Structures are given as structure tokens and as C-alpha cells.
């Protein structure tokens, strides 16, 4: 236990090394057959019709908003308690992010908060499946259908998350992340699933310069026909090196998430006797992927502030995370929306702390965290 226990560590093994070696020796290392296999695997996992692999979930959000023609004068509803890339992409396209509050105990954006924020300018709704649990997506999607507004699910935390018996992303449009701390990772990467064929076609163009084909298609066809720009696009394709790692991780998903679940249960049992408050679980039927294990550290209740707790854990060789600092409290958005008040978001943003949670953690590692929390409670 002398080594520092990080907040997260990717679970990499000989299988990932072998997958990378195979790609390196194949003669084709950029976007190619491994991308195609990854996309097919995600269609099988989710049950959706189309999958588009991209260089990051942020890239996926960017081109999805672009494909939906989100721009100047439009509004997009999203929680403030999310990673800032969503707000940034909305803003960079000239649209206005309309930040709404979340449930105080699940941190999920609610259908009621979404519906109350709709105006004639609303073009999209971006709910977040938070920490590995699902938002009430049926109710949110029903609002989108009623008002004719697109719903883009932020599923960055939700590889392996199920809602009412179906994997997140089973219908509609959802964006997953393969960042280094996610449930499956390839260092950097993302993937969009959708049941909209026209949207899928636009996304494939936008992710690769606006061309009608990608580099692998061009090589396979002997560069005939010559590719041409159909619409201005970006360089957001995923390499086959990354895709091969993600595919290997996907095979291990059930094992990886089972281990996360075991650690989460160990935390839950110990926290029942401590003042630190874990998140509540959603009321609807679901399978939690346990991307994060979050506690709320209320100084009056716990005898220690969140920041002091994080520092004290660090001194004991334990890393933590903060998911997330509310976007509307950060400089750019604070100055842009100076009167915005989101009480539940703000209360949680000042108190949330993510404990170490990753598949290679041992029971002794989790016990080390629990012992430290027991020592610090009431200080």
C-alpha cells in the first residue's frame, strides 16, 4: 500500500498489446478494418442501426451539432453539471447553451427542468447519463418528440449502462467516450450511434474532411472514384491502432464492469456508517456501469470540507477526482450568464468528490480508501 493509489488507471494487458502489434504489422494503421469492426460491435452492443467511430466524444458532439445545423440564434438545453466540452462546442457554433438544474441526489437532469427551459429557439436537448447510471431517457425523448426537438444523449459515462432492459443508445442518437478513465478506453476516442440514416451519412462526411469516402475506402477502391468534398468537414477519424485497443476492451467489458460494481458495493457498505453521502440511484429499472463513485462532502455534516478531504486523502496516498465543477461557475460562462442560479447544481459542485474506482483495484485498495475516510470523518 506504499504506492500512490490513483483516482483511475486504465486496465491494459497482453491482449491490448497483441491487438496493437497486429495493426502495426498489418500495413494499415489509420482508419480501416478495425474501425469497421468496432462500429459493428457497438451496433450489436446497443442494438442501434449505425455507429460512427471518431477521435473523441468531443469531436462526436461537435459534428453531431453541426449535422443538426445548430448555429447562431439557436439554443441547446444541457445541464451545467457536465464536462465543459459540450458547452464549448455549443458556444463555438454560435449557439446559446441553456443550462438547467439537476436532481439534487442523482445529479440527473430532469424532464421537468428540460421542458421548462424550452423556447421557440430550442434546437437540441443534451441529457447526461451520469457516473454510469442512466437518465430517464424515455421521458426526455418524449419531450423532444412532442416539441420536435433533437435529443443527443451524452453517453460518455455509459458504456455498459442499461435502462429498462436496453443498453443506452438503443435508439435515437448517443455519443460514447473511450477516454483514458472511461469503462473501456483506447487512450482517446469516441463513437456515435444513431438510428437516423441521413444523420449517419452526414457524420461520416463531417468526420473526414467532408469527403464521401474515407482513406480506407479510397485505398480499397484503388483511389477510383476520386474523393471530392461534399461539405466542409474535419479530421476527426479514429486510427485503427486506437480502434483495436477499444475492440479488445469491449470484449472484456462485462468483466471490467463487474469489478467496478464489486468495488462500488464495498464502498456503499462502508459509507452506510459514515457521514459522506453517495449519490442516490435512479428509481427506474437500470444496470449501473459504475464509471464513477461519487460522494458529497458537506462540511457541516462531515466535519471536513470537500477540498480539505481531497488534500488529506492525497497526503495518505489516495487520488480523487471532481466530476464536475459546474460549467456556469467557471470564468467564461460565469461572465456570460452572470445571473444564472442552479441551486442543486451549485450545492453539489461544491461538495462532490470521486473516489478511486477502476477494475485493477484490489479489495485492499478499497479498504485503504475506506479506512482513510473513517479516520477523516468528523475532523
UniProtKB/Swiss-Prot annotation:
Keywords: Aminotransferase, Antibiotic resistance, Lipid A biosynthesis, Lipid biosynthesis, Lipid metabolism, Lipopolysaccharide biosynthesis, Pyridoxal phosphate, Transferase. It catalyses: UDP-4-amino-4-deoxy-beta-L-arabinose + 2-oxoglutarate = UDP-beta-L-threo-pentopyranos-4-ulose + L-glutamate. Its EC number is 2.6.1.87. Its cofactor is pyridoxal 5'-phosphate. Pathway: Nucleotide-sugar biosynthesis; UDP-4-deoxy-4-formamido-beta-L-arabinose biosynthesis; UDP-4-deoxy-4-formamido-beta-L-arabinose from UDP-alpha-D-glucuronate: step 2/3; Bacterial outer membrane biogenesis; lipopolysaccharide biosynthesis. The modification N6-(pyridoxal phosphate)lysine is found at residue 182. InterPro entries: ArnB_NH2Trfase, DegT/StrS_aminotransferase, PyrdxlP-dep_Trfase, PyrdxlP-dep_Trfase_major, PyrdxlP-dep_Trfase_small. GO terms for molecular function: pyridoxal phosphate binding; UDP-4-amino-4-deoxy-L-arabinose aminotransferase. GO terms for cellular component: membrane. It comes from the Bacteria. One of its GO terms (biological process) is lipid A biosynthetic process. Catalyzes the conversion of UDP-4-keto-arabinose (UDP-Ara4O) to UDP-4-amino-4-deoxy-L-arabinose (UDP-L-Ara4N). The modified arabinose is attached to lipid A and is required for resistance to polymyxin and cationic antimicrobial peptides. PANTHER family: TRANSAMINASE (PTHR30244), UDP-4-AMINO-4-DEOXY-L-ARABINOSE--OXOGLUTARATE AMINOTRANSFERASE (PTHR30244:SF41). Belongs to the DegT/DnrJ/EryC1 family. ArnB subfamily. Homodimer. This is UDP-4-amino-4-deoxy-L-arabinose--oxoglutarate aminotransferase.
Amino acid at each position: 500500500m506504499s504506492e500512490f493509489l490513483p483516482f483511475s488507471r486504465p486496465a491494459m494487458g497482453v491482449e491490448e498489446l497483441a491487438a496493437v502489434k497486429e495493426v502495426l504489422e498489418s500495413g494499415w494503421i489509420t482508419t480501416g478494418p478495425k474501425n469497421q469492426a468496432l462500429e459493428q460491435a457497438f451496433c450489436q452492443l446497443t442494438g442501434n442501426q449505425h455507429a460512427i467511430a471518431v477521435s473523441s466524444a468531443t469531436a462526436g458532439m461537435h459534428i453531431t451539432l453541426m449535422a443538426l445545423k445548430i448555429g447562431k440564434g439557436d439554443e441547446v438545453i444541457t445541464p451545467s453539471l457536465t464536462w465543459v466540452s459540450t458547452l464549448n462546442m455549443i458556444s463555438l457554433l454560435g449557439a446559446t447553451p441553456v443550462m438547467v438544474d439537476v436532481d439534487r441526489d442523482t445529479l440527473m437532469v430532469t424532464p421537468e427542468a428540460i421542458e421548462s427551459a424550452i423556447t421557440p429557439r430550442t434546437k437540441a436537448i443534451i441529457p447526461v447519463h451520469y457516473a454510469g447510471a442512466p437518465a430517464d431517457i424515455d421521458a426526455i425523448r418524449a419531450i423532444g418528440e412532442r416539441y420536435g426537438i433533437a435529443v443527443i444523449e451524452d453517453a460518455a459515462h455509459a458504456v455498459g449502462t442499461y435502462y429498462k432492459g436496453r443498453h443506452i443508445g438503443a435508439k435515437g442518437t448517443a455519443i460514447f467516450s473511450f477516454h483514458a478513465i472511461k469503462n473501456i478506453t483506447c487512450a482517446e476516442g469516441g463513437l456515435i450511434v444513431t438510428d437516423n440514416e441521413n444523420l449517419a451519412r452526414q457524420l461520416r462526411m463531417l468526420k473526414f474532411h467532408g469527403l464521401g469516402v474515407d482513406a480506407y475506402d479510397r485505398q480499397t477502391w484503388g483511389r477510383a472514384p476520386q474523393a471530392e468534398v461534399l461539405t466542409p468537414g474535419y479530421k476527426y477519424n479514429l486510427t485503427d491502432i486506437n480502434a483495436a485497443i477499444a475492440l479488445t476492451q469491449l470484449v472484456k467489458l462485462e468483466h471490467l464492469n463487474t469489478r467496478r460494481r464489486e468495488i462500488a458495493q464495498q464502498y456503499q457498505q462502508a459509507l452506510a456508517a459514515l457521514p459522506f453521502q453517495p449519490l442516490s440511484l435512479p428509481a427506474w429499472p437500470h444496470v449501473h456501469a459504475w464509471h464513477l463513485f461519487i460522494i458529497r462532502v458537506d462540511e457541516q455534516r462531515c466535519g471536513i470540507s470537500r477540498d480539505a478531504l481531497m488534500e488529506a486523502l492525497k497526503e495518505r496516498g489516495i487520488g480523487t477526482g471532481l466530476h464536475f465543477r459546474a460549467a456556469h461557475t467557471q470564468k467564461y460562462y460565469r461572465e456570460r450568464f452572470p445571473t444564472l442560479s442552479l441551486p442543486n447544481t451549485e450545492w453539489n459542485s461544491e461538495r462532490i468528490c470521486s473516489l478511486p474506482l477502476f477494475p485493477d483495484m484490489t479489495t485492499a485498495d478499497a479498504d485503504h480508501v475506506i479506512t482513510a475516510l473513517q479516520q477523516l470523518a468528523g475532523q
